[in-house]
């Protein structure tokens, strides 16, 4: 699906140790609403986009977010939001938000552990686990399509099977579940000694987690479960049916704030290639390269070519 990625602000109400953004990026002034709306127009004319995906920082802190959503909807575009859902813990806020923009958008919230103290230690915000959980339940109650996301990280990867059990015990099967390998950039790279985990170490926990998904499915619990940023050569082929490429990986436009080391103004970057995939030296020798999701570029650079086991 042709997508425009919007990052209107890097301001956030959490401070996750493996955030892909640098903390210094929060200093940038949010993108003006007029620039965002004109960027939607331009992306529609130039590339016939079908969806707007809004991230951050925390997009709910951007005061003009409802205007962005309603404008995109008027243009016939689908809306996706990546949010920690802390603000949705307030039922009154959620009701007001839904009254303004409707409930026909998709929202993804990441939980970093099913153990509240562990999650809070990663976000550096005490009580964030319970608030995000309340927020997600408020959204589900309001009819919003919700996805729960887990990023495989060095601090909690060994609890991934337990996390899967928690997802099935906590959320209805209409809630999708995605597992992603970590993008080692920004704060994640700065804190790599505790955030990075080699694929060979997380493999057994990921496979056990997917065994649990299969068990639930066989018992009639059918949930949309996907795994991203995971090369085929790092997991048993039995589990390949769960691995996905991002739909927008080869077809994304983006309106981004400048990077932490740049003073350039925001502008739309068109026809961006995904920052990764199966494009590394060992991948060229692999017979399944064309169907492989690959992984993040900086993650592959961090672990080196030895992480790959190409199929010949």
At which residue positions do the language-model features occur?
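Radical SAM enzyme core and accessory elements
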Residues: 1, 254-312
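Canonical Radical SAM [4Fe-4S] cluster-binding loop centered on the CxxxCxxC motif
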Residues: 1-35, 46-47
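Disulfide-bonded cysteines in secreted/extracellular proteins and peptides
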Residues: 12, 16-19, 233, 283-286, ...
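Secreted/processed peptides and extracellular or luminal domains of membrane proteins
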Residues: 18, 22-25, 239, 289-292, ...
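A short acidic, helix-capping loop that chelates divalent metal ions and anchors anionic groups
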Residues: 25-27, 115-122, 186-191
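Radical SAM enzyme [4Fe-4S]-AdoMet core and its adjacent flexible, acidic
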Residues: 36, 125-137, 141-271, 275
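Radical SAM/AdoMet-radical enzyme domain recognition
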Residues: 37-53, 62-181
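Active-site beta-strand/loop signature of hydrolases that rely on acidic residues for catalysis
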Residues: 56-57
């Amino acid at each position: 699906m042709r997508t425009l990625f919007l990052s209107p602000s890097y301001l956030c109400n959490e401070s996750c140790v493996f955030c892909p953004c640098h903390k210094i990026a929060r200093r940038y002034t949010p993108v003006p609403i007029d620039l965002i709306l004109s960027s939607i127009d331009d992306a529609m004319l130039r590339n016939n986009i079908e969806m707007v995906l809004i991230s951050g920082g925390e997009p709910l802190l951007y005061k003009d977010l409802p205007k962005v959503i309603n404008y995109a909807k008027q243009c016939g575009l689908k809306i996706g939001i990546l949010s920690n859902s802390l603000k949705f813990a307030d039922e009154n806020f959620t009701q007001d938000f839904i009254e303004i923009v409707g409930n026909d958008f998709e929202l993804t919230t990441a939980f970093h552990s099913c153990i509240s103290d562990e999650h809070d230690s990663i976000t550096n915000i005490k009580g964030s686990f319970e608030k995000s959980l309340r927020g997600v339940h408020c959204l589900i109650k309001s009819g919003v399509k919700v996805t729960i996301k887990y990023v495989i990280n060095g601090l909690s990867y060994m609890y991934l099977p337990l996390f899967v059990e928690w997802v099935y015990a906590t959320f209805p099967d209409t809630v999708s579940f995605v597992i992603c390998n970590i993008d080692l950039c920004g704060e994640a790279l700065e804190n790599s000694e505790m955030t990075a985990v080699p694929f060979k170490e997380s493999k057994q926990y990921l496979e056990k987690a997917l065994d649990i998904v299969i068990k639930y499915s066989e018992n009639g619990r059918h949930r949309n479960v996907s795994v991203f940023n995971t090369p085929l050569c790092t997991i048993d082929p039995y589990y390949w049916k769960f691995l996905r490429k991002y739909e927008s990986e080869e077809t994304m436009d983006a309106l981004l704030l400048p990077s932490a080391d740049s003073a350039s103004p925001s502008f739309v970057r068109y026809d961006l290639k995904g920052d990764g995939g199966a494009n590394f030296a060992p991948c060229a020798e692999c017979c399944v390269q064309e169907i492989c999701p690959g992984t993040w570029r900086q993650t592959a650079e961090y672990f080196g070519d030895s992480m790959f086991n190409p199929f010949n």
